């Protein structure tokens, strides 16, 4: 049975200093979204390293908070952040709004355990009765 309302997906990529690779990641995320019969409602990229100067990330999170997306496709978690506290805050925010995260390069569950976030996120979800 086909889902009448395809998932609304946002694509995000960030590889500082490498526009070609960033665009390749966006293309692969778009292909995955199309394969999953999702509706791509937005795309953003960031060019800079660090956490503060990331307008693409901020726009994506505005859309999350506004309830405009159901899923975020990213190529790898490091494109969000390599820091545990930033990743935890990211997952808190998307979970509060029921947004699913899909990574293409590897298993998200395995990667969260590598970042020591698996149990933290599961505990947070249980405390707040989130899926």
Sequence positions of predicted segments:
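Short, structured surface patches at the beginning of a domain
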Residues: 1-131
């Amino acid at each position: 049975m086909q889902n009448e309302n395809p998932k609304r997906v946002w694509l995000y990529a960030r590889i500082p200093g490498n526009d070609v690779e960033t665009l390749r990641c966006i293309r692969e995320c778009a292909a995955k979204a199309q394969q999953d019969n999702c509706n791509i409602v937005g795309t953003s990229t960031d060019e800079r390293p660090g956490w503060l100067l990331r307008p693409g990330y901020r726009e994506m999170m505005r859309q999350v908070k506004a309830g405009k997306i159901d899923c975020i496709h990213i190529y790898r978690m490091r494109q969000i952040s390599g820091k545990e506290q930033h990743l935890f805050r990211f997952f808190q925010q998307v979970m509060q709004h029921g947004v699913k995260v899909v990574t293409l390069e590897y298993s998200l569950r395995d990667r969260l355990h590598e970042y020591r976030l698996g149990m933290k996120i599961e505990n947070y979800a249980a405390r707040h009765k989130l899926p």
